[in-house]
């Protein structure tokens, strides 16, 4: 799935606790930025300046990204996280997600297209933090 994102400078999701365009960095150089898509919809883009396979395979510029989309929970409904990153981004992704969601006891739906060993580590961490997590996978055997 390809998503074209445009940042809206005056947009602030009503219930997300976020700083517009906030960035979290680590010693490894990975960071996560927040890009609002629409009311209640936020892209969490994990960035890495290091050389990765995408640069070689797809002739992209140096570095790679891991894009996730978070849909705000409506009253009485679960928040929806689509395509969380792999374990390499967990140290920058999980703190931002925790800040945005606030209450770890709220239901959380996680949607993935496939599950691989890299993603399983982050999914395990999510399940430990959010006991009401429900995983939806369209191709769990891939």
Describe every region a protein language model picked out.
Residues 87-136:
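Active-site metal-binding motif and surrounding structural segment of the metallo-beta-lactamase
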